[in-house]
Amino acid sequence: MGPAGLKVLLLLFLGAFQGSFTKKKNLQSVCGRPVHTGRIVGGQDAALGRWPWQVSLRFDYTHSCGGSLISDHWVLTAAHCIKKTWYSFLYSVWLGSIDREYSSTGKEYYVSRIAIPDKHRHTEADIALLKLSSRVTFSSVILPICLPNISKQLTVPASCWVTGWGQNQEGHYPSTLQELEVPVISSEACEQLYNPIGVFLPDLERVIKEDMFCAGERQSRKDSCKGDSGGPLSCHIDGVWRLMGVVSWGLECGKDLPGVYTNVTYYQKWISAIISRAPPGWGGDSTHMTSCSLLCYFLWLSWDPPEPLALA
């Protein structure tokens, strides 16, 4: 290769490096900073743009769970929201809207690939990454939320905010996104609530695992519920909103026991590993994925998949 060829390679390398650096820098400058920052009142309709990372995860065009936009290509949700990972072509996400149904401000993106931890069983390792088939365009109503900064010790505030279109106290599913401030409860304190005899039986298996924590108001009966699963527990830390929890499960929404959340910090290394090893065309641009989609679609037409676990 001559000097001209080496020069071209060097320019390509520098361009790729600069693009990667700029993208990372830009993400950190916009994540967790909603344009609309008005006063939040709990247990009511959310304002448009207040939670711009909120996702409506749809299976076969119907809302099934919540989720959180964490970059221009990735969404984080709960693993139990995913019926079958090879059904990725039937999943889409709805962004930029507070309406459960379609609206003029929202935009739909299709899922090209799904990643779930190998150790996921029922409520354990209840976390999933969804790669979108096209890049998300950020706006005043579509922005990512920051992930926890594992390079330094973060102090989780006494209360955070849960959002979603889940079932309310009347048993109805609201059409408008709901927001609720909930107190954060440590894993140990929550374990005593869910497993009161555990203190007398130290060998008894824990209910609240090391990758879980709780949040919710026991007395006021305010909590996340069915339909909120996979949605964010957003905490305001160091001037930005960070995704500290994913709505996972609970028993009888808002009745004496708090909701249980997957601890995002616990899975931060897993998240980084999945995203870093996914090349630009991972999933959506794959010929194998396209041909598989047609086959899977015909299989899906002839088989009714089971409902996902939806305790939260």
Swiss-Prot record:
Keywords: Disulfide bond, Glycoprotein, Hydrolase, Protease, Secreted, Serine protease, Signal. Gene3D superfamilies: Trypsin-like serine proteases. GO terms for molecular function: serine-type endopeptidase activity. It is found in: Secreted. Pfam families: Trypsin. Its main location: secreted. Disulfide bonds join C65-C81, C160-C235, C190-C214, C225-C253. CDD domains: Tryp_SPc. GO terms for cellular component: extracellular region. Transmembrane segments: none annotated. This is Serine protease 48. It comes from Mus musculus (Mouse).
